[in-house]
């Protein structure tokens, strides 16, 4: 007989996942290479909340992690990457995955990524102005910005694929073990 998940179990799972997400983002502040890895792993945890507890609880966890991250994570860029793009992406990914053909699907995903990144850095530049920069540096900065944005698109496409694979692994391997351990099999 299959046991049903109680509301208290769902709330506890949601709270634990949210706390772990914030802890990961705090860890991303300490370990420089984890600056982009921490929000990506945190977004995977939000996706597991969606799978275990439903979309409403997942959006609640996303909102809690975003707010707590912006309040407590010292490196605001990590919290903003989660809040502006990676945190909610697993929740809207199924809608993007229905788009056909696949080339259009990828274009739509990259448009979301670019819009989110440009909005985030525009906000950062408004809050923390860069001051006056010589014309020579502006040209170099534009080229580097475009190069970085291109590399970010490649990284986002890889993240999208990795998220798909990790969720499949979770569903096939980790979720049954979690349910068995908790007596929910």
Give, region by region, the residue ranges found by the protein language model:
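Hydrophobic transmembrane alpha-helices
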Residues: 2-53, 57
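Alpha-helical transmembrane segments and their cytosolic interface
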Residues: 2-3, 7, 142-185
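Hydrophobic alpha-helical transmembrane segments
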Residues: 11-15, 37, 59-63, 79-80, ...
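Interfacial aromatic-anchored transmembrane helix boundaries in multi-pass membrane proteins
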Residues: 26-35, 66-95
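Transmembrane alpha-helical core residues of multi-pass small-molecule transporters
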Residues: 42, 61, 65-69, 85-86, ...
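Mid-bilayer segments of alpha-helical transmembrane spans in multi-pass integral membrane proteins
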Residues: 75, 110-127, 153, 157-158
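Short helix-perturbing small/polar motifs within transmembrane alpha-helices
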Residues: 83-122
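Membrane-interface helix termini and inter-helical loops of multi-pass transporters
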Residues: 127-141
């Amino acid at each position: 007989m299959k046991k049903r998940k109680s509301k208290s179990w769902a709330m506890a799972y949601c709270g634990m996942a949210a706390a772990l997400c914030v802890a990961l983002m705090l860890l991303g502040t300490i370990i420089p290479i984890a600056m982009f890895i921490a929000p990506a792993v945190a977004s995977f945890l939000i996706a597991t909340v969606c799978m275990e507890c439903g979309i409403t609880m997942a959006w609640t966890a996303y909102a809690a992690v975003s707010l707590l991250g912006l309040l407590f994570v010292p490196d605001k860029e990590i919290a903003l990457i989660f809040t502006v793009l990676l945190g909610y992406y697993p929740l809207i990914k199924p809608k993007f995955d229905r788009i056909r053909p696949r080339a259009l699907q990828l274009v739509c995903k990259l448009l979301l990524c670019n819009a989110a990144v440009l909005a985030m850095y525009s906000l950062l530049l408004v809050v923390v102005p860069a001051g006056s920069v010589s014309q020579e540096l502006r040209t170099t900065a534009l080229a580097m910005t475009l190069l970085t944005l291109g590399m970010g698109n490649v990284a986002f496409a890889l993240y999208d694929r990795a998220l798909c694979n990790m969720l499949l692994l979770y569903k096939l391997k980790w979720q049954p073990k979690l349910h068995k351990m908790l007596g929910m099999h």
